Regions:
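Hydrophobic or amphipathic, alpha-helical segments that drive membrane association/targeting
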Residues: 2-92, 173, 215-220, 282-283, ...
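Extracytoplasmic and endomembrane cell-envelope/extracellular-matrix remodeling and assembly machinery
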Residues: 27, 39, 51-53, 59, ...
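Short pre-active-site segment immediately N-terminal to the catalytic Zn-binding motif
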Residues: 103-117, 179-182
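Catalytic Zn2+-binding segment of zinc metalloproteases
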Residues: 113, 123-140
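Membrane-active amphipathic alpha-helices enriched in small hydrophobic residues
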Residues: 140-158, 163-175
Length: 470
């Protein structure tokens, strides 16, 4: 064994001993307080950032999170995972199990294990309650101040309220909330162990940290060190490389991940968040030069999405047909085909494909939602409503499903029910004033069913409580 390897092994053993010897932390936040702050932060994020509220993207990232949580074990919080439009290379965990990934980070990834490594790292911060530990036990810090501090960590995100950022500096919370080196090492150590349990390749942690180091070096001149949510990637990289050396004999147990779902998810994100001409150029280069078969094939999928966005539907369908030929058993590609047909106004063809696809996989909320839209556009509003209610039960914070339900009720002349659904749409879009306005009207409308009036009252009370407490 080399002297460097011996030194790294010794370092890891020392750090593990120190970690086990750390005293139990005193938390400034109770579980209930953390949940309340999480609710407020989510409302604020919806207001100031653009969350990709797409059932396809949402379902993938949350399924992946659930896979990690299965090995993590019981938790205090119900975790939720979101993709936010931003070219920043970042992800952050907020209180109460809210985890946000920037589209710029996803763009830099090349395989699913890299996404899992970051996802597990953020879960490590939440399950260790690092934010609660960062609080000063002797000082009463409001949820609003904590919110400002978290907002300050999201430096450089287009659309982030300048008032929030300025306030976070004035409140002095940004420095207090910075993760320590020990926090980062604990999150990396937990992530490493969970990936091993999942038989995922933890070398992906090393790959992501190398990318982070390169990007941090490039951007360091513009971003103060104390504002980085994950400081010092060099030290983290050394620590993870030490763990990899320590467990190198277990590398044969790591399974090769099928990256189809990840690559499809990645292109679905990028086509909504990046310049299409630049993305087309990237896809063309990948198609011509990449040696990995899946990466090369799915670059054509990216080209199909770009053509569809540019309303070149025939070319999009031709590109997608080539991808389907490479993956004949992937039902989700049939849904993608139907969506392009729907965009082209070919509703009968889209409906036939979506009916068959949903029958094969009734858990696919993306397919269900698109089928509901096709049914509504074809005048079959009764079935559309049934399908939309299924989606609403599975994804109760997806704004567009309530917009579609509101449209159906408004077209029927049921204005009260339409206002109720419109209120929920605005609520999950982050437009609180409009949400309150419509929910109050629905609550007072005697034509609105009692259970809807009660739900409107409950939402209004919850909003009042959150605003009062924070």
């Amino acid at each position: 064994m080399s002297a460097l390897s011996t030194l790294r092994h010794t370092f890891v053993y020392i750090m593990l001993f120190v970690a086990l010897s750390w005293p139990v932390q005193a938390y400034a936040l109770s579980i209930g307080e953390e949940r309340l702050i999480g609710q407020k932060i989510l409302y604020s994020v919806r207001k100031d950032l653009r969350i990709l509220d797409d059932p396809d993207i949402n379902q993938y990232i949350n399924r992946l999170g659930s896979q990690v949580l299965q090995v993590v074990g019981p938790q205090y919080f119900d975790y939720r995972f979101f993709v936010v439009q931003s070219d920043q290379f970042n992800a952050f965990a907020a209180p109460a199990g809210l985890v946000f990934f920037y589209s710029g980070l996803i763009e830099a990834m090349r395989k699913e294990d890299e996404l899992v490594s970051v996802l597990a790292h953020e879960i490590g911060h939440v399950t260790s309650r690092h934010l609660a530990q960062r609080m000063d036990k002797g000082t009463k810090v409001s949820a609003a101040s904590l919110l400002l501090g978290l907002a300050g960590l999201a430096l450089g995100v287009p659309g982030l309220s300048q008032g929030l950022f300025t306030g976070s500096l004035a409140a002095g919370q940004t420095i207090n909330l910075r993760y320590s080196r020990e926090d980062e090492e604990q999150a990396d150590r937990l992530s490493f162990g969970w990936m091993q349990e999942m038989q995922r390749n933890p070398e992906s942690m090393q790959d992501m940290l190398r990318t982070m180091r390169r990007i941090t070096r490039y951007r360091m001149g513009n971003v103060p060190q104390y504002l980085l949510t994950h400081p010092n990637p060099e030290a983290r990289l050394d620590y993870v490389e030490s763990l990899l050396e320590l467990h190198s004999q277990q590398s044969s147990a790591w399974t090769k991940t099928d990256n189809f779902d990840f690559l499809r998810f990645r292109y679905r994100v990028l086509v909504q968040t990046t310049d299409l001409d630049r993305l087309r150029q990237y896809c063309a280069i990948t198609l011509a030069q990449d040696k990995d078969a899946d990466t090369q094939r799915m670059a054509r999928f990216g080209l199909a999405l770009i053509d569809a966005q540019n309303r070149r539907f025939d070319q999009a369908l031709e590109q997608l047909a080539l991808v389907q030929g490479q993956y004949p058993d992937r039902n989700i590609l049939r849904v993608d085909q139907a969506v392009i047909l729907q965009m082209a106004g070919r509703f009968n063809e889209a409906k036939a494909i979506l009916d068959a696809s949903v029958h094969r996989d009734p858990t696919d909320m993306y397919g269900l939602f698109k089928l509901a839209q096709v049914e509504a556009a074809s005048g079959n509003t009764t079935r559309a409503e049934v399908l939309l209610q299924q989606v609403a039960r599975a994804m109760p914070e997806y704004p567009q499903v309530f917009f579609e339900l509101g449209q159906i009720e408004a077209n029927r002349g049921a204005s009260g029910k339409g206002m109720f659904y419109l209120g929920k749409y605005y609520l999950y879009q982050g437009q609180e004033d409009l949400a309150v306005q419509n929910l109050r009207r629905a609550r007072r409308d005697t034509s609105v069913p009692k259970h809807m009036q009660e739900e409107a009252e409950q939402i209004l009370a919850e909003l009042e409580h959150i605003n009062k407490e924070t």
